[in-house]
A protein has these predicted regions:
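Extracellular/periplasmic bilobal clamshell ligand-binding domains
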Residues: 178-209
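A bilobed periplasmic-binding-protein/Venus flytrap-type ligand-binding module shared by bacterial periplasmic
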Residues: 17-24, 134-149, 165
Length: 209
């Protein structure tokens, strides 16, 4: 974004979550790692959004950086071989798992919150070392024609009472940035971007067959 935006800010965060249908799975029987999603035990029982877009893409690319290419490619191919349900978005993952059409799903914390507000039988599995925190970001485009209005908005969304409302309504997990001990805080994002074209080519070939 260098040279494109100015006044780039980070505030608060959501997170990726692995969810389960609590009517169908005891939490003690749930996977201990997202690497287990390729196990035959979970064949045709896992849902996730297309890994080419949005937070799912961010998470999947971060896993490549964390695990290395060989393990990551094998895991992605394993998801396909295990007949993972690839759907149009994170909210659809919540609906499928809530309805029992899938037993497990990768989604976002705010989508899970919506499902819980609808009394769906859902819970998340604490796998912080494998689940990507998603800081909120806001920025103004360089030479924006309405820079004063843009700056007013940037300041507004970071006001303490606005952040408190976002947390209260589960749009954010916290008004603060993710804790430093979160494994994905140390991910080398320039490395991810350097391999982005190659990574997306692999994902298209793997998931869009």
């Amino acid at each position: 974004v260098a040279g494109i935006v100015v006044d780039f800010e980070e505030f608060g965060y959501r997170s990726r979550v692995l969810i389960v249908n609590t009517n169908r799975i005891e939490l003690s029987e749930a996977p201990k790692s997202i690497k287990d999603l390729v196990s035959r035990k979970w064949k045709n029982k896992v849902a996730m959004a297309y890994p080419l877009f949005g937070t799912t893409a961010t998470h999947i690319l971060a896993l490549k950086e964390a695990w290395g290419s060989e393990i990551w490619e094998s895991w992605c191919e394993g998801l396909v071989a295990n007949k993972t349900k690839i759907v149009d978005g994170n909210s659809m993952v919540v609906r499928l798992v809530g309805a029992g059409e899938a037993l497990l799903g990768l989604t976002d914390s705010d989508d899970l919150a919506v499902g819980l507000s609808q009394q769906l039988p859902l819970a998340s599995i604490p796998l912080e070392n494998e689940l990507c925190a998603i800081p909120n970001t806001v920025a103004m485009v360089k030479d924006a024609p309405h820079s004063e209005g843009a700056m007013s908005f940037i300041n507004y969304v970071q006001r303490e009472e606005i952040l408190a409302d976002l947390v209260e309504n589960s749009a954010l997990i916290s008004a603060k940035l993710p804790p430093e001990e979160n494994a994905f805080q140390s991910i080398f994002w320039p490395g991810i971007l350097a391999e982005e074209k190659e990574s997306f080519s692999f994902l298209r070939d793997t998931f869009l067959r």
